[in-house]
Amino acid sequence: MKVHVYTDIETLFGRACRVWMDTLLDAGHDIEFIDLGTNTDAPLPNVGQADVNVLVAGIYALPRFAKHGLPRHGRHVLWMFDPLTKNEASVHRHKASLFDALAPHLHAVMAMDASIERYVAQHFPALAVFWLPYLVAGKHVRAPLLETQRNRGIVMLGGDTPRRREAEKRFLASPSPLNAEFIWSGLWGAARDACRAGSRISLSIHADAEHTYFDQFRAFETWALGTAVVSDHFEGWESFGIEPGLHLAMASPQDMPQVCAELLADVPRREAMVQASQQLLREKFSPAAWQGRMLSMIESVA
């Protein structure tokens, strides 16, 4: 089978693409990777025929597909990591509009969580939907840095929103001095990995309070690099095998400075959290654990 794997942000979704490429190559399929880049206006490249197109698409590829259509050949499967909501008060609402324009032309969706499964079932009941969370290859799960090797305290990597700005103000106003960095943009690839690996705590804060979800990409990549996560509250952690307090600390933004201060002072606890979270990645979220299901998904669509 000939499979094309597309993405738009290689420095963000590149590892997710390689998970698919390695899995399909190991099964004897013919694979080609197409990096669309971040241009939302250019026509799609002419890369020839394929039986299946796996689209690991974000905010650049979705409008490009909506404008120029999907690849001309093959059947189309979208691996959806962005949250979907029609709530007009949420900063995520535009992603649903982009998805809705694309959905009638898809043959299947791989949903990162149950909320996306429900969205597709409600609005596009004829569209096949599978659950496939973000996966991390074992070769990307690194030994954690020693405490003395870490060069950052608390780090938040993500888009700038009013809710996150409020969280930043709370850290700045904390009675105990906390070395917290809120980095809104400009850090990708190896530099992003180094930042996460060198930090003692990585924050995961919802962009808004209207649509909350488990940010797998942020948490799993951070765990793989050996750093503890303090997360905003989210539902559905049980379905991922996550135990708050064991794999991550969970707190509301107003409580995060205190939770982080306590965690910074407790190196053994942070080390235990990293060990538990990396074990969870290896057991539940490695490509090896999902290989059979991944191949079955592709074969059912082809």
Describe each PLM feature range.
Residues 1-50, 57-68, 78-240:
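Nucleotide-sugar donor-binding catalytic core of glycosyltransferases
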Residues 228-232, 246-252, 293, 297-302:
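Short, contiguous hydrophobic alpha-helices characteristic of membrane insertion segments
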Residues 242-254, 262-267:
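Conserved acidic donor-binding segment of nucleotide-sugar-dependent glycosyltransferases
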Residues 264-298:
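A charged, aromatic-enriched C-terminal amphipathic alpha-helix characteristic of glycosyltransferases
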Residues 222, 248, 277:
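Hydrophobic, well-ordered secondary-structure elements that form the walls
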Residues 46, 195, 259-262, 297:
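CheY-like receiver
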Residues 75:
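Non-catalytic, usually N-terminal nucleic-acid engagement modules in DNA/RNA processing proteins
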